[in-house]
Amino acid sequence: MTSDQSLSHHEPLPLERLGRTHFVGVGGGGMSGIARIFLSRGVPVSGCDARESRVLAALRAFGARVTVGHDPAHLSDVDTVVASTAVPPTTPELAVARERGLPVLPRAAALASVMAGRRGVAVAGTHGKTTTTSMVVRALQRCGADPSFAIGADLGEPGSNAHDGTGSIFVAEADESDESFLLLPFHAAVVTNVEADHLNHYADLAAIHAAFDRFVAKVPDGGFLVACTDDPGAEEIASRAARRGTVVRRYGTSPRADVRLVDLRLEVAGSRFAVAMDGTVLGELQLRVPGAHNALNATAAVAVTVGLGFPFSEVAEGLADFTGARRRFQPQGEVAGIRVFDDYAHHPTEIAATLRAARVVADGGRLVVAFQPHHYYRTADFRTEFGAALALADEVVVMEVYAPGETPLPGGTGAALAAAVPLPGSAVVFEPSWSAVPEHLAARARPGDLIVTMGAGGDVALLPPLVLDALRRRWQG
C-alpha cells in the first residue's frame, strides 16, 4: 500500500457485504484474531498459512476452514480475500484473486469492519503496542466492560488474542508498518512512541511522523489522544494535534504529563509506582511484569481507561492481575537455577528496554541472549544500534536474519550484526544454524543466569523448549 491521505477517509465495509472471507496468512497474530471475530459474527471464514501451528489448530476448533500452504484452489467459493502484510502481493493466491476481480483487503480494512459501530480505542506506536493494548483490555475487563479486542499476541491460551464482547468498546492494536492504521475508526487513540522503523515502506522519519499526524487527526469530536510526553516523537505528534484542537492527554514521568508516573520502584517480580492525574495522586499501582517501559505502558492504560470514565481503583486491580502477553518477556521454564525467557523484541529500542528489565529480574545473575534479526533492511539500517543494545547482555548468540523472500544486503546479515556488538570476542558468537543455538546457550549459562531468546519470529520462536532440553542434558544428565 502506498502513502495515500485518502486512507484516513476510508469508510469500513459492512461485514454483510464481505460474504465468505479467505485470510491469506491467517496464522499471524493480528490476522487470526480478526478471523475469530468474523466467525463470532457469523461470517464464513477460510484461511491458509505457510506452516502448521497451534494458532491454526485453534482456528479450526473455532469453526474456520484452514489449510497449510498457499494455493489458488483455496479461492473456489470465496467472496472476499484478506491479505497479511507478511505475505508478498506476488503470492499466486493473491495474484489469482485479483485476476478474478475478488476484493483483496489489507488486514486493517478487515479490522475496521469489525470495529465499526463500537467505541474504538486504537493503540499505536513503534514499540509497546501489544502490551499496552493488552493492559487496556485487562483493565476494562476488571471494570466489567466486556470489551471486544484484537491484539497481535495471545493473552494466554491459543486464540486469546481476540474477543467479540458484549460491551460498547473495541480495543485494537494499530499497526503503522504500512500506514493501514489510517483505515481504523476510533474514539480514542494512543501513541506510545514514534521512532524510525519500517524504512522499507517509509522514506524517512519525517514520513513516519506524517503518517502518525494523519492517524491522530482521525480522533473525532468528543474523543481524545493519549500520548507519551517522555518520548520526543510522540510529544511532537501530540503537540501538533493539540494545536489543531484535538483533546490530548499526555502521560509519562515528565512534570508536564497530565497523567504522571511517580515514585517508580523496580523489583525482581515487577514494579510499584503511583499515578497522579492533573496534579492529584489517584493511587498506587503494582505490576507483575518487569521494567520501566511496562510501567509507562500501564500509565497509558490508566490514561485511556480513566479517560473513558472508569474508576482508577478497578483499573489498578485489572493491571495488577496482568501477567503479560505471549512472547513479551514470557517465562518459559527453569533448569538448575537457569531461567529461560522469550521475547518479541526486534528493534534496538525494544531490545534495550527488555534487557534493562531482564537485568533487574536476573538479580545478580548474568544475561545470556540469543537474538534473531528480522529483515535485512532493518538489520542494515540499525546495525550499530542493535550492537549497542545487545551489549547490555553478558553473552550473545546472533542468529542469521529471518527474512523469507528477501535478498541479503551488505551490512544486513547476522554475521555483520555480530561483529557490531561491542563485547569481548569470546562473549559474542554468530551461529547461522538455528538448531545449534540451544547447545550454545546451554554451554554458556550457569546457575543463577537468565537466558533470553529474542526476535520477531521465524526460528527463534521455536527455541525455548529446545533450550530447556539442552539445559537438562547438561545439568541433569
Curated annotation (Swiss-Prot):
One of its GO terms (molecular function) is UDP-N-acetylmuramate-L-alanine ligase activity. GO terms for biological process: cell division; cell wall organization; peptidoglycan biosynthetic process; regulation of cell shape. GO terms for cellular component: cytoplasm. InterPro entries: Mur-like_cat_sf (IPR036565), Mur_ligase_C (IPR004101), Mur_ligase_C_dom_sf (IPR036615), Mur_ligase_cen (IPR013221), Mur_ligase_N (IPR000713), MurCDEF_pg_biosynth (IPR050061), UDP-N-AcMur_Ala_ligase_MurC (IPR005758). ATP binds at residues 125-131. Keywords: ATP-binding, Cell cycle, Cell division, Cell shape, Cell wall biogenesis/degradation, Cytoplasm, Ligase, Nucleotide-binding, Peptidoglycan synthesis. Its EC number is 6.3.2.8. Pathway: Cell wall biogenesis; peptidoglycan biosynthesis. The keyword Nuclease does not apply. It is found in: Cytoplasm. It catalyses: UDP-N-acetyl-alpha-D-muramate + L-alanine + ATP = UDP-N-acetyl-alpha-D-muramoyl-L-alanine + ADP + phosphate + H(+). Gene3D superfamilies: Mur ligase, C-terminal domain (3.90.190.20), Mur-like, catalytic domain (3.40.1190.10), NAD(P)-binding Rossmann-like Domain (3.40.50.720). The keyword Secreted does not apply. Coiled coil: none annotated. Cell wall formation. Belongs to the MurCDEF family. PANTHER family: UDP-N-ACETYLMURAMATE--L-ALANINE LIGASE (PTHR43445:SF3), UDP-N-ACETYLMURAMATE--L-ALANINE LIGASE-RELATED (PTHR43445). This is UDP-N-acetylmuramate--L-alanine ligase. It comes from Acidothermus cellulolyticus (strain ATCC 43068 / DSM 8971 / 11B).
